Swiss-Prot record:
Listed transmembrane segments: none
Species for this entry: Arabidopsis thaliana (Mouse-ear cress)
Subcellular location: Nucleus
Biased composition annotated in UniProt, kind: Basic residues: 846-856
Record-given protein name: Histone-lysine N-methyltransferase EZA1
Biased composition (Polar residues): 1-11, 68-87, 393-419
Location of the SANT domain: 489-539
Annotated stretches, region: Disordered: 1-34, 66-87, 366-473, 827-856
Residue spans of biased composition, Basic and acidic residues class: 374-392, 438-451, 833-845
Function description: Polycomb group (PcG) protein. Catalytic subunit of some PcG multiprotein complex, which methylates 'Lys-27' of histone H3, leading to transcriptional repression of the affected target genes, mainly abscisic acid (ABA) responsive elements. PcG proteins act by forming multiprotein complexes, which are required to maintain the transcriptionally repressive state of homeotic genes throughout development. PcG proteins are not required to initiate repression, but to maintain it during later stages of development.
Gene name of the record: EZA1
Reaction equations catalysed: L-lysyl(27)-[histone H3] + 3 S-adenosyl-L-methionine = N(6),N(6),N(6)-trimethyl-L-lysyl(27)-[histone H3] + 3 S-adenosyl-L-homocysteine + 3 H(+)
PROSITE patterns attached to this UniProt entry: CXC, SAM_MT43_EZ, SET
Length: 856
């Protein structure tokens, strides 16, 4: 009995648990239905309120526009009430006269008789219809086709010429499949899905309830919920990242700060978001950097009041400097002095001991005592500092220097720039001066034995002083006028500031002025950069025989022997020792390229893609695999065997096949060719000086030296291109620009162009075709002719293939331009076919074949 009772009690308990679960599920479903009804009423109420708010806002806008007219109408009604009749309404009801036409000779008179006039018909002269014209966008350079402009896999539509009927032209195998319309959820529906999903989850019961409420499939609801969940996650991450402070970005390095800009910047066109090469390009770092821009320190002027060159102002020692130690306590009003000459000078002057000063290299500079800044003339020479025998010689020496304008006791920082802390530290005593002087002399002797340049010890921490003369002393001493606290060097350098500094050294060398002005503007001063450069002993990138910018005498920076020295550039090549290259006119390009050009074969050009080889190109180099030459945009070294080395042509020789560039179908590059140069002025604005009498004649496309082209009605077919000014034979007329599309895309577009009896397709290379139908320039309207006066030629310009139009003969002004479209035997229209007797073989013509049938 006990067992039976226990079993029965267990069954009763299980039934009770099942009943509780069922009640909870029912309560949950009932709560879900109530929640859905509540959300529905809430969203509907919000929608009604938003509609009312929009309606009220629109009503106010309408009132603002209508109020002037309403006030004018009310004023007119007031005038009618006062007895003034409405003349407009009265004239409409009772006109003065009714006219059916004008009599001869009375068209200009105001009053016309009321009798009817019989109108005469006028026959207009017959005017010929203008040719059909399609809208197009002007391009001054080629562009890659946008992804959404492709016709592959899309239904193409064209208009029949005669009837104007709209027809569909698509391949049967590429008929677009009908896409199911995707459900667009409203803002209210998104709110319901998101809130219910967050509160109740996305179980089957919840999905069924949402399906009944929104009349949407469960799969669409689940997909939409996942999209909303992903958006919420992204918004949360963006919100957490948006709360940064201003200083956090400075804690990142330059590479992290420019991470998003590296791929957006085109290093071939020097623009962001390049439409020719794409906005996301692989970053290729050249193995050899360009030499930094250099100038001598003696040729520069201080860039600001915080410039380190201010510390190099001339310091002339007055008579009171020698007796400063003994009279400092008596003259409390005398200004404190920092040290300007060697610590041996004041001690020797006070004791009357003769002192031999070492010979140093100084520059001949003109001194302006009013400003305290050296006016440097750039005249450099070596002068011997005279022997100082007594302290009384100092004033006489100072007067002599003013007459000769050449400072013999002038101090110059030879290998480093002292910090302001050292220059301002002027109150230190002369304790230990003798020891310091001994150490300095020993270091000078050691430097002589090693062969290093002797550092100028006239300014250091504990043994020299700069003296401020008495007012009205007349000694003409030059000092630094302002040593403000703001000019003190900053000790903290953020990572991005350090990276910017290193990049500045790479570009400008050890030029603190240019680094601070161009890369650290607002972050560091010129003096900060100079002190950081000295304290950290940063070695200059790409050391060579280039003189150190901090050395006044043009000596090279010591310690360069162990560094890797890259090949010297043309700028720093020694005179009389020009580097000789194994070079011939037929070995500049790749052998296969030269054979193809020399053989006159009309083969397609190869698309160039820069290689990322680190040093020398091997068998796996993309350029070698693609049978193209390495260019200046590649990462390989300049000594690469596959590198195109340009030409060495003399003046006016680059327009013949003797020029390697011209023979290879290339334009000369001023960065590669030896004697080809580009100048934009006379040098007054700091541009590169001229290197010869005339510019190279094989850079027309690069410099955009095109002729003026006019658009007009052609006598042959449709529209035509006309020349404004007369040109000689082989003159460059302009560039044929358009969209860069693939060959597969060109085949699909060509079917539409064939039906419309027009084509603007031009084969460019093995990967791209130019299409000027939608985008291009006015040369797209140049028509085909069996006897053309122009010819098209594909040229390789700055790493890209471009189509140039050149004069085949002398062309007079206002003459229409024609060139051969290179039609096939049965492709040319009737008007464009050659006469039967003309069977001239023109297979050796160097310009490429265009996919054209007729230009309108």
């Amino acid at each position: 009995m006990v067992t039976d009772d226990s079993n029965s009690s267990g069954r009763i308990k299980s039934h009770v648990d099942d009943d509780d679960d069922g009640e909870e599920e029912e309560d949950r479903l009932e709560g879900l239905e109530n929640r859905l009804s509540e959300l529905k009423r809430k969203i509907q109420g919000e929608r009604v309120r938003s509609i009312k708010e929009k309606f009220e806002a629109n009503r106010k806008k309408v009132d603002a526009h209508v109020s002037p007219f309403s006030s004018a109408a009310s004023s007119r009604a007031t005038a009618e009430d006062n007895g003034n009749s409405n003349m407009l309404s009265s004239r409409m009801r009772m006109p003065l006269c009714k006219l059916n036409g004008f009599s001869h000779g009375v068209g200009d008179r105001d009053y016309v008789p009321t009798k009817d006039v019989i109108s005469a018909s006028v026959k207009l002269p017959i005017a010929e219809r203008i040719p059909p014209y399609t809208t197009w966008i002007f391009l001054d350079r080629n562009q890659r086709m946008a992804e959404d402009q492709s016709v592959v896999g899309r239904r193409q539509i064209y208009y029949e010429q005669h009837g104007g009927e709209t027809l569909i032209c698509s391949d049967s195998e590429e008929e677009p499949e009908p896409e199911e319309e995707k459900r667009e959820f409203s803002e209210g529906e998104d709110s319901i899905i998101w809130l219910i999903g967050q509160e109740y989850g996305m179980g089957e019961e919840v999905q069924d309830a949402l399906c009944q409420l929104l009349s949407v499939d469960a799969s669409d609801i689940l997909e939409r919920y996942n999209e909303l969940k992903l958006k919420d996650k992204q918004n949360t991450e963006e919100f957490s990242n948006s709360g940064f402070k201003l200083g956090i970005s400075l804690e990142k390095g330059l590479g992290a700060a420019l991470d998003s800009f590296d791929n957006l910047f085109c290093r071939r066109c020097l623009v962001f978001d390049c439409r020719l090469h794409g906005c996301s390009q692989p970053l290729i770092s050249a193995s050899e950097k360009q030499p930094y821009w250099s100038d001598y320190e003696g040729d520069r002027k201080p860039c600001s009041k915080h410039c380190y060159l201010q510390l190099k102002a001339v310091r002339e020692v007055p008579e009171t400097c020698s007796n400063f130690a003994s009279k400092a306590e008596e003259k409390a009003s005398e200004e404190e002095c920092s040290k300007a000459v060697s610590s041996d000078v004041p001690h020797a002057a006070a004791s009357g001991v003769s002192l031999q000063v070492e010979k140093t290299d100084i520059g001949i500079k003109n001194v302006d005592s009013s400003s305290g800044v050296e006016q440097e003339h750039g005249i450099r020479g070596k002068r011997e500092v005279p022997i100082l025998k007594d302290s009384n010689d100092l004033p006489n020496l100072s007067n002599k220097k003013q007459k000769t304008a050449a400072s013999d006791t002038k101090m110059s920082f030879v290998n480093s720039v002292p910090s302001l802390d050292q220059a301002l530290d002027s109150t230190k005593g002369d304790q230990g001066g003798t020891t310091d002087n001994k150490v300095n002399r020993d270091s000078e002797a050691d430097a002589k034995e090693v062969g290093e340049p002797i550092p100028d010890n006239s300014v250091h921490d504990g043994g020299s002083s700069i003296c401020q003369p008495h007012h009205g002393s007349g000694n003409g001493a030059i000092i630094i006028a302002e040593m403000s606290e703001t000019s003190r060097p900053s000790t903290e350098w953020n990572p991005i500031e350090k990276d910017l500094y290193l990049k500045g050294v790479e570009i400008f060398g050890r030029n603190s002025c240019l680094i601070a002005r161009n890369l650290l503007s607002g972050l560091k001063t010129c003096l900060d950069v100079s002190n950081y450069m000295r304290e950290n002993e940063v070695s200059v990138f790409r050391r060579s025989s280039t003189p150190n910018l901090l050395l006044d005498d043009g000596r090279t920076d010591p310690g360069n022997d162990n560094d890797e020295v890259p090949p010297r550039t043309r700028l720093f090549r020694r005179k009389g020792k020009t580097r000789k290259l194994k070079y011939s006119t037929k070995s500049a390009g790749h052998p296969s390229v030269w054979k193809r050009i020399a053989g006159g074969k009309n083969q397609s050009c190869k698309q160039y893609t820069p290689c990322g080889c680190l040093s020398m190109c091997g068998k796996d180099c993309p350029c070698l695999t693609n049978e193209t030459c390495c260019e200046k945009y590649c990462g390989c070294s300049k000594s690469c065997k596959n590198r195109f080395r340009g030409c060495h042509c003399a003046k006016s020789q680059c327009r013949s096949r003797q020029c390697p560039c011209f023979a290879a179908g290339r334009e000369c590059d001023p960065d590669v060719c030896r004697n080809c140069w580009v100048s934009c002025g006379d040098g007054s604005l700091g541009e590169a000086p001229r290197r010869g009498e005339g510019q190279c004649g094989n850079m027309r496309l690069l410099l955009r030296q095109q002729q003026r082209i006019l658009l007009g009605k052609s006598d042959v077919a449709g529209w035509g291109a006309f020349l404004k000014n007369s040109v000689s034979k082989n003159e460059y007329l302009g560039e044929y620009t358009g969209e860069l599309i693939s060959h597969h895309e060109a085949d699909k577009r060509g079917k539409i162009y064939d039906r419309a009896n027009s084509s603007f397709l031009f084969d460019l290379n093995d990967q791209y075709v130019l299409d000027a139908q939608r985008k291009g320039d006015k040369l797209k309207f140049a028509n085909h002719s069996a006897k053309p006066n122009c010819y098209a030629k594909v040229m390789f310009v700055a790493g890209d293939h471009r189509v140039g139009i050149f004069a085949n003969e002398r062309i007079e002004a206002s003459e229409e331009l024609f060139y051969d479209y290179r039609y096939g035997p049965d492709q040319a229209p009737v008007w464009a076919r050659k006469p039967e007797g003309s069977k001239k073989d023109d297979s050796a013509i160097t310009h490429r074949r265009a996919r054209k049938h007729q230009s309108h």
